[in-house]
Amino acid sequence: MKHLKNNTKKFTALLFALLFSMSIAGCNMIEKTPEAIEKSPVAKVGKKTITRGELDTYPILAEQLTKLKEQFGGDLSKNAEIKDQLIQFKSQVLEQMIQEEIVFEKSEELKVDNAKVEKEVEKNLKNFMDQGFQGNKDKYKEDLKKMGTTEESIKRFFKAQVITEEVSKQVVKDVKVDDNTAKKHYEESKYTFTVNKPTFHAQHVLVKTEEEAKKVKARLDKGEDIKKIAKELSIDPSAKENSGDLGKAPYSSMVKPFADAIVKLNKGEISQPVKSQFGYHVIKLIDKDEVTFKDFNSVKEQIKKDLLETEKRKVFNEKIEQWKKELKVETKKYEKNII
């Protein structure tokens, strides 16, 4: 009897496992309808759910999807050639939509004037229709359909622009840049404020690690030829042909760490190892032009203006990140719905 009970338990467990696996397989075999796909969530921002349909009809994305469908055919999600790029592009657009939903949510707390927003949105929509469609409502609707977007998506797009601007004004209203900050920036970036455009003639050896760069520096300090070392060790693809000789180049054409190091060198001097996104450089300055700098007072206001815009963007982006945490933005569990 005990043996029979054990067998019954085993049979029940096996039957349950079989039924469960069949139900899972069945779920995977069922194709979602276009309507179900459109309603699939791709992100949640507070209480607001962004759906796949809203994402795919977002004007910038919709136009690109239409072009890709013309080029690669109907179901882009099954095209291995472009799948990764499609996911990346959609994720970028979704991030933009998330930011917009955050701004919509917070605009109520900040008491943004809705009547003013609506008036500005209607004005922008009219300009868009007049300039792109000569005010022809039927052509407007027809072309939006061809683009894969909707009137509702276009209106939301313009509304997001207006509300973002209004919210941003409130967030960054206290941001200031004083003369001292501008002066500090001028001194640190002096070579971007030159009357002429001086060039620098340099040779370098590029290696992967700081330790390797230190060894290169030691060999150069002992008098070894940089051309010989560049041909031997440099990971710069052009080094085999040019022996590390970069020719003459202006400050603006160099990556910043390299440029900042080279301006401190005198002719014939060799730098300490310099890290950039390419690796570690050891640089020898062959020659450089004489340089004349613009007077600080002549560029002060432009510097302040540029720094102010940069600081405003920084403050606004930080606020968005703060709000994102407050609203518990969720995208991870909806990743499978993005394509």
Curated annotation (Swiss-Prot):
Enzyme class, broadest EC rank: isomerase
Its EC number(s): 5.2.1.8
Keyword Cell membrane applies: yes
Domain of life: Bacteria
Reactions catalysed: [protein]-peptidylproline (omega=180) = [protein]-peptidylproline (omega=0)
Lipid attachment locations (S-diacylglycerol cysteine): C27
One cellular component (GO) term of this entry: plasma membrane
PROSITE patterns referenced in this protein's UniProt entry, alphabetically: PPIC_PPIASE_2 (PS50198), PROKAR_LIPOPROTEIN (PS51257)
Biological role: Plays a major role in protein secretion by helping the post-translocational extracellular folding of several secreted proteins.
Protein name: Foldase protein PrsA
